[in-house]
Amino acid sequence: MTNKANPSSSKEAVLDAAELFFAVRGYTAVTLKHIADKLGIKQASLYYHFPLGKEDLYVEVMLRHLEHRRISLERLMSRAEPTLESYLLEVGVWLIQQPPLNGGRMIMSDLPELSSEKAAQLEAAIYRCAFAPIEALFIHYRHELKDRFQNDPGFIGGTFLSSLESLYTVRKYGSKTDQELVIDLIELLLRGAHSG
């Protein structure tokens, strides 16, 4: 008979449990005890996989999460019709169905608590995996934007992403479908709310 390792103590199980906590609560509000309790293991067991502790666990969790997001965004964009609105709709519906990244909280609260090296690593990953794919859409389709936005595709891309994070909450209290919410956001972003 072979001895099987406790599946809840495997590195993947630790990463999965930690991701649930860090995504919702952020770095500072989560303790290693929260994660260990969720897994039904002793807190000291977490140091087997993450000898440097909470910061290393957080960084690995978030890098994995961001990379998954980047791969998913690329997959979604590869199957959308090649128009700005189709890309934004495909990506937008998917994003509001995911737990929000809470990029603002990460940048304002989580990253300052990390070592400067780890913070820079995560900040670069946030840009590369979450922001750059959307910014690239607006760069590619800048000719469809009003003149004043053509030279700042990052602003309009960031506005789209920030608005989507808000829609994650709005969708819980309204009667519109996810697709209707994203269509309205795209309309508002690309053409504005002004009727005149």
Label the model's feature ranges.
Residues 17-24, 71-76, 159, 163-170:
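Solvent-exposed, amphipathic alpha-helical segments
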Residues 70, 74, 101, 117-144, ...:
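Amphipathic alpha-helical packing segments from all-alpha helical-bundle domains
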Residues 62-68:
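Short, basic, alpha-helical segments at the C-terminal edge of helix-turn-helix-like DNA-binding modules
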Residues 132-143, 147-150, 158-196:
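C-terminal peripheral helix-coil segments that are non-catalytic and often amphipathic
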Residues 2, 9, 13, 17, ...:
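Helix-turn-helix
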